[in-house]
Amino acid sequence: MRHPLVMGNWKLNGSRHMVNELVANLRKELTGVAGCDVAIAPPEMYIDLAKRAAAGSHIMLGAQNVDLNLSGAFTGETSAEMLKDIGAQYIIIGHSERRTYHKESDELIAKKFAVLKEQGLTPVLCIGETEAENEAGKTEEVCARQIDAVLKTQGAAAFEGAVIAYEPVWAIGTGKSATPAQAQAVHKFIRDHIAKADAKIAEQVIIQYGGSVNASNAAELFAQPDIDGALVGGASLKADAFAVIVKAAEAAKQA
């Protein structure tokens, strides 16, 4: 049985005070939680501080992006080796905000995926369709294309130990969310698509839902068989709300 993972993407939010306070509150709120893996991805400059604040807890660290290169003259970038060295394990790639604002292509994201795997880190591959693509009935086509960028270059084996986050772009930060049934249908499609290449790996891969996940809709989402957790944005900045989501995942997958 897949072990659920709830990960907080803090995006461009944080300060030394905020990191210490939020992690301390998370530790209190998550006391006794063992049935759901928990990770947080602060801005890069706060990963080390968050790691120290989380020391001795079950909270794992992640990052929001990575560069293709391991070292060299690449101003402003952060390598997989650096993230590994500082203690980050779950690395978000392909987020719609990176695809949109930084023009990241499927091919570039697939290369980042490969670099992370080579370094023993866990890629959290974000995929999902825009509102226009959704309305045009292209959800499955878009998700398949984004997955195939990895499948066709690295094979299904690359997804072993990796995480996929289905984030419909129209639901990110908008307050809108796919219904549990809509989300489940896409998650099942993603799993079935990978299963065409390798059924065993498809069954094992964690597929998170992201897109305005909050304390009120989490339990219903996690009740779906192919939703294995969540990649949480705004709600991850509030310890109590994030903890409700984590506990909902734990309860749903133990049921």
UniProtKB/Swiss-Prot annotation:
Residue numbers binding substrate: N9, W10, K11, G173, S212, G233, G234
Active-site residues, record numbering mapped to chain: H95, E167
Domain of life assignment: Bacteria
Biological-process GO terms, alphabetical: gluconeogenesis; glyceraldehyde-3-phosphate biosynthetic process; glycerol catabolic process; glycolytic process
GO molecular function: triose-phosphate isomerase activity
KW RNA-binding (keyword) present: no
One Gene Ontology CC term in the entry: cytosol
CDD domains: TIM
EC assignment: 5.3.1.1
Catalytic activity: D-glyceraldehyde 3-phosphate = dihydroxyacetone phosphate
Pathway: Carbohydrate biosynthesis; gluconeogenesis; Carbohydrate degradation; glycolysis; D-glyceraldehyde 3-phosphate from glycerone phosphate: step 1/1
Transmembrane segment boundaries: none
Pfam families in alphabetical order: TIM
Record keywords, A-Z: Cytoplasm, Gluconeogenesis, Glycolysis, Isomerase
Places the protein is found: Cytoplasm
PROSITE patterns: TIM_1 (PS00171), TIM_2 (PS51440)
Keyword Isomerase tagged: yes
Subunit-structure text: Homodimer.
Family classification: Belongs to the triosephosphate isomerase family.
Protein task: Involved in the gluconeogenesis. Catalyzes stereospecifically the conversion of dihydroxyacetone phosphate (DHAP) to D-glyceraldehyde-3-phosphate (G3P).
Listed name of the protein: Triosephosphate isomerase
Species assigned in the record: Salmonella typhimurium (strain LT2 / SGSC1412 / ATCC 700720)
Gene name, Swiss-Prot/TrEMBL: tpiA
